[in-house]
Amino acid sequence: MKRTYQPSKLVRKRRHGFRSRMETVGGRKVLASRRAKGRKRLSA
């Protein structure tokens, strides 16, 4: 059986990176809530 997590830096950046978050309204909300919470890292 193949494991579900197959790490890839490129895919990680494209799916969960800052720029991809900024592209959508939902992503912006994610960043806003993480800023409000005071997260050191906002995105991957």
UniProtKB/Swiss-Prot annotation:
Renumbered residue ranges of the record's region Disordered: 1-44
UniProt GO molecular function: structural constituent of ribosome
InterPro entries per record: Ribosomal_bL34, Ribosomal_bL34_CS
Bias type Basic residues, positions: 10-19, 31-44
Disulfide bridge positions per record: none
One CC-aspect GO term: ribonucleoprotein complex
The UniProt record lists the keyword Ribosomal protein: yes
Record keywords, A-Z: Ribonucleoprotein, Ribosomal protein
GO biological process: one example: translation
Family as reported in the entry's similarity comment: Belongs to the bacterial ribosomal protein bL34 family.
Protein name (record): Large ribosomal subunit protein bL34
Gene source species: Acidiphilium cryptum (strain JF-5)
